[in-house]
């Protein structure tokens, strides 16, 4: 009698799988992402006024440092200079302060929890590109408080010993290893606040 639910065919001692449509398919889990925005109204006129032309200059250098095994950037560690990255300047308004506080309370990238500025708020910004030494400039700034942000990618080289074989002379046994290198890519978010107190001054800042 033929078995209509048979999923294997046996011929000459060989087993062949036969495709049978499953009655149930488990759906993939969707990555849950939470996005938060400040619950404060954005004053575009205030932001526009803060970004109007002045006569002060903000000059800075952007860099990061490689974290140690405890996830800490050592104070005396070598600088990794920000080569050709975009630095964004935002005016520090009440809306921005609400966003910054909300980010401290809610942001958790591992749990896919993000805090964003509104599109209108992010539109009021200035941008600069660093040179190969990490230097950048924002000219013609008015007195005020500003927030700087950039994302600095870099590659960390690590090493390990790969076992290649064993030799024995009958008395002693020796294991041999080759030193191998591999790379890990990182991207650090670097930020700083800067205050321009008066027109005509040059304010220097370290963005790290």
Identify the meaning behind each predicted range.
Residues 132-140:
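Short, surface-exposed beta-strand/beta-hairpin micro-motifs centered on an aromatic residue
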Residues 141-150:
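A short tyrosine-centered beta-strand micro-motif
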Residues 95-103, 112-133:
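Short, acidic Ser/Thr/Gly-rich low-complexity loop/linker segments typical of extracellular
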Residues 153-154:
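Short, charged beta-turn/beta-strand-edge "cap" motif at the junction between a beta-strand
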Residues 1-24:
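Bacterial Sec-dependent N-terminal signal peptides
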Residues 23-108, 157-208:
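Primarily secretory-pathway and cell-envelope proteins
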